């Protein structure tokens, strides 16, 4: 049973465990995989297999992440779990593992701790849209009032960071009991309750192809007699021949029309998310379009220069800076396909940022970039990556 292939017909959702060190994230991950694989097929994973998370690289940053998958009655889930706090910070900021929702694991015996708060804040900053709470180690708390108090604290903390604390599902259980095969309320029943909350509380994410058309410009060619061809990989949506599109970023936004879509030298009537295409533009000159701009559905995305961001600064060991940086530091910000210079304003209470830190900053770019909250970028100095970031809030 355990080795059966997953049914890919079910909708796919990405989730992950977050929360304070030793509150039981990895144990819960193992418990979910074990209980659900017995019910719906798939592979059970042992604690040690998940805890020995392999190294991977995202934007030049080394991150340890364990990926497991499981099924519920309605869905297929990909689930990430990180061994260390630093791995969570890097993972969430680089978007190496984009989450449609997070499972916040909080020990009922300890209540919310510093990393509980920090992970909720990070989830807010990087745009994790939904959080479900698993109140773990409930077998260690006999006092019902104490449980209620911890639940209230967690709800208040979620509300403080703009999550709907009062409406958030909170499941009480014990990952350890569930993993040991306990069939009771705190064991298997709690895991099934969690699976149910995942299915009902996190909406099915929009597929890339259903979004508004967007394609980062990688290259521009002039073809005599045909006009200007822009190449790139369609990030989301669909582009059909004859549709109006906007060229956004760097310069003033311009309108144009798609008169052809080519893929592998063949003419198509449309291109869609994931396709590497050449798009022929009517009446657009070669010099009107450049790398770093995007082609987009009219009105769907706007250019901005001023925003707040959550960034992770590479440590010296990761090939980052050897020294801290200060207010008004001016690196390049690499968005999609190009670098734009910008200046960094640090929070009032931060005099400097050390390599290996994560920090909230405000950025002013010298040229506008087509931007949305949640957009990832790299921070570079002369072509060398020194940090990674994500747009938290657009100012103008």
Curated annotation (Swiss-Prot):
It comes from the Bacteria. It catalyses: GTP + H2O = GDP + phosphate + H(+). Residues 60-64 are annotated as: G2. Residues 81-84 are annotated as: G3. GTP binds at residues 19-26, 81-85, 136-139. Residues 136-139 are annotated as: G4. Keywords: Cytoplasm, Elongation factor, GTP-binding, Hydrolase, Magnesium, Metal-binding, Nucleotide-binding, Protein biosynthesis. One of its GO terms (cellular component) is cytoplasm. Monomer. This is Elongation factor Tu. It comes from Burkholderia mallei (strain ATCC 23344).
